């Protein structure tokens, strides 16, 4: 996933340690139980917080966020982190931001300043930005947006997209394997 390279760097540094709480789509059968990929990469998962959303009405989302705050707070009190790293803009990430803010644990927000037009995600992402002490954005435009939200420029760092490192460090699949996996045969010209 997007955080795997960062987690590898932290794991290699003897002065640092990290605790990993996995929730959301990582635990979803529909999304392929991707927490198993985390385990396959030899990362210890300190806790799994299973949160099921039962509908998409405002009251369902409020229940989900409330449950997430309650469960994440319980784990944070137990783990006592010095810093919380958050990537994303989903309900559970927003909930983790609320918990960290209330427990006065600094938040390091990754990929802030981005825009998802026509989606509520922007509101959650920008709220997480406002709760955060450190900001690691993917480009200068997003740095400008985080700055416009009133954040200290000294705490905003342009580091590029985490997906780029993931792609650069991925093993490429052969053309033949793609054809086999997708049950197709590439022609001279192909349209994706």
Give, region by region, the residue ranges found by the protein language model.
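Active-site and donor-binding regions of nucleotide-sugar-utilizing enzymes
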Residues: 1-11, 48-153
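A generic N-terminal leader/anchor concept
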Residues: 11-17
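A nucleotide-sugar donor-handling region in carbohydrate enzymes
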Residues: 25-32, 131-192
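Conserved nucleotide-sugar phosphate-binding/catalytic loop shared by glycosyltransferases and other
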Residues: 17-64
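Short coil/turn segments at beta-strand junctions that form active-site/ligand-binding loops
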Residues: 16, 82, 188-190
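PLP-dependent amino-acid enzyme catalytic core
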Residues: 13, 47, 59-79, 158, ...
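Structural beta-sheet core signal
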Residues: 19-22, 86, 109, 158
């Amino acid at each position: 996933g997007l955080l795997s390279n960062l987690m590898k760097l932290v794991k290699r540094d003897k002065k640092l340690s990290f605790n990993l709480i996995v929730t959301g789509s990582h635990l979803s059968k529909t999304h392929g139980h991707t927490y198993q990929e985390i385990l396959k990469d030899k990362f210890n998962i300190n806790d799994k917080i299973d949160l099921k959303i039962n509908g998409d009405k405002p009251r369902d989302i409020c229940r989900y966020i409330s449950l997430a705050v309650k469960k994440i707070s319980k784990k944070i009190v137990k783990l006592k982190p010095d810093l919380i790293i958050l990537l994303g803009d989903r309900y559970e990430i927003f909930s983790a931001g609320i918990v960290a803010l209330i427990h006065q644990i600094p938040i390091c927000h990754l990929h802030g300043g981005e825009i998802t037009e026509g989606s509520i995600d922007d509101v959650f992402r920008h709220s997480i930005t406002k709760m955060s002490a450190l900001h690691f954005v993917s480009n200068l435009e997003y740095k400008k947006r985080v700055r416009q939200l009133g954040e200290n420029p000294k705490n905003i760092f342009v580091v590029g997209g985490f997906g780029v490192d993931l792609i650069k460090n991925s093993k490429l699949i052969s053309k033949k394997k793609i054809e086999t996996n997708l049950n197709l045969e590439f022609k001279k010209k192909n349209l994706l």
